Amino acid sequence: MATNPMHQFNVYRIGPEIKLGEIDISFTNAGLFMAVSSIAILLIFNFGSKKNSLIPNKIQLLAELSYSFISKMISDTAGSKAKPYFSFIFSLFMFVLFCNMFGMIPYSFTVTSHIIVTFVLAAFIFIGVTIIGFIKNGFGYLKLFVPSGVPMVLLPLIVIIEVISYLSRPISLSVRLFANMMAGHTMMKVFGGFVVSLGIIGGWLPLSFTVALTGLEILVAFLQAYVFAILTCIYLNDALNLHH
């Protein structure tokens, strides 16, 4: 791991090998950190909502701020019709955020640095939003691909572009998160090794750069969770509030 910056992304088995036919379903480090992230979320918000005192403690304050933040994001992006989906958006944001943050711990594993994880999340969102769109609007949901005010001569081309854009949503959503997390952690590993090499000559400048880069990566971890959640809200808004 010290010499290969890509080694940190390796998935390895924890415990005995378990197979279902030809499919390996063994418990891995990826499964471990997804479970740890989920348990951490449950514990924090369970303790944060247990007392519900007038003067909140730090955990309760964190829970209340998180609730208000996501609630406002949904209202501003998808409107009041999206309120029934608050629990899903909230859980999605927190899961991605905690997976990103746990990946910042040395010798841990960044779940969201693997395209299969981010693509499954994005595909689930894409399928769910599409189903909601047809349930709410029937075949009128297809109006999403027919922008108003487009000249008839350009309409076939615009419809094709809109359909391709719609079908590429899970790809763009998953690749954005995966690429940013993998690139950020790779850069941190490479730069960290560079700082260790410079340690023989001393100096605070390389260490300061490492601290600054770590702070930047923490910010990126939050922003990527936010972008993932807000794009989900935008897609949900298209399904609930057709404006074409």
Which residues does each PLM region occupy?
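Selective transmembrane helix interface/packing segments
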Residues: M1-H244
